[in-house]
Amino acid sequence: MLSRRKFIKACLGAAGITAFGGLSLRAWAGGAGERTDAPGAAAVPQNGLADRPRYLGLEESGELERRERALWAKMESCDLCPRRCGVNRMAGRMGACSSDQTFIVASAGPHFGEERPLVGRHGSGTIFFSNCNLLCIFCQNYQIAHHGAGRQLTHAQLADIMLTLQRRGCHNINLVTPTHITPHIITALRLAIAQGLNTPMLYNTSGYETLEVMRLLDGVIDIYLPDFKYQDSALAARFSQGAPDYTLHTAAAIKEMHRQVGTLRQVGGVAYRGLLIRHLVLPENLAGTDVFARWVVSELGADTHVNIMGQYSPRFRAREFPPLDRRPTQAEIVQARRWAEAAGLRNFH
C-alpha cells in the first residue's frame, strides 16, 4: 500500500504530468481523455449505496446551478477562503493561493493509501489540485502545494477524470486541496453529472475554510475529510504563512461539516457519507493533540471518526523551525493516542 508521500512521488515521477494508476494527465491536456475501454475501467455499480449522492437532487432542482454562480461571483473579489485576498482572479490576478482564473491538476488515480473506509476494494478516486491557500512551512506535498506542479486542464477534462475514476470502481471522488478552486469543481461536477456521475464527492481540505463557502457546499459534498492542524493561533501564524485565524475558522468549518453530513456512515466497510478528521502529531505537541481531542468530544461527540497521524517528517522548510526539524518520537505518538483515549474518543486510529 502506498503512503500519501509515495503516491505523490509516483505521480510526480514524470514532472507532474503522469498520474498514478494509469490515468495520464498528458492525455487530458491534449484533449484526448481516457479510453472508456481501458483495462480496469469496468465500473463497480454505485447503486449499492444506502443513499444516492445528494448533489444529484441539487442538480435536478436547479439549486446546484445557483450555487455554481455564487461561487464564481466570489472569484471577482476573491473571498473563497479566510484570507479574503479581494483580488479579481477572473481578470487573471493571482491570489495568496498562487491561482488565477485557471486551475492545475497534479495527478489523479485510484489511491489505496487513504483511510480504510475511504479505500475499500477499489481505491479512493483521488484528484490532487495544485497550489494551496494555507501554505504550511512543513508541507508534506510542497511540490504540489507550493510549486504548482501539474497541468492546467479544462472543466470538460476534469469531468472526464471524475467519470474515469467512477468507471474504475473508485468508491469516491477525492478532491485534494479544493478550497481555492471550488467554482471550477462545481462546474466540472455538473458536466460529469450530465454524463452519469453518481459517486460520492469527498472534500479533502486543510480545514482553512469560510462558513459561506461551506454552506454553498451543503448537499454537494458527501464526505468531508478536513485537517485540524493547530490549537494555538500563534503557531498557525508562524507555520502557515500568517494565518493566525486558522484555529477559529477551522473549528467553525468542521462544526458546519458535521452539521451537514454527521458521523461517518459506511456500508460494507466503505464510507458513503460523513465526517472524518485528520490530525497530524507534531513534535513537542505543537499540534495541541490533547486540546484537539477534548474539543472533538465536546463539540462533535465521542463517536466522531478521527485519524491521529504519526507520519510527520521534516520537509520543505521545516528544518528552519525547530522542533519541526525532527520527527515526533514514538513516545510522543503514543502520548497523543493516550490523550485521544482519555478524552473519550471512540473512533480514532
Regions found by a protein language model. Name each.
Residues 173, 201-203, 224-226, 275-277, ...:
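Hydrophobic faces of well-ordered beta-strands that scaffold small-molecule active sites
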Residues 218-232, 305-311:
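Non-cysteine beta-strand/loop elements that form the S-adenosyl-L-methionine
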Residues 145, 182, 207-210, 228-247, ...:
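Conserved radical SAM core fold
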Residues 98-219, 223, 233:
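Conserved Radical SAM active-site core
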Residues 1-16:
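N-terminal secretory signal peptides and thylakoid transit peptides that target proteins
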Residues 48-78, 82-128, 143:
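N-terminal [4Fe-4S]-dependent radical SAM core
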Residues 162, 186-189, 214, 254, ...:
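Generic structural signal for well-ordered alpha-helices
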Residues 239-243, 253-288, 292-293, 311-312, ...:
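Conserved strand-turn element in the central/C-terminal portion of the radical SAM core barrel
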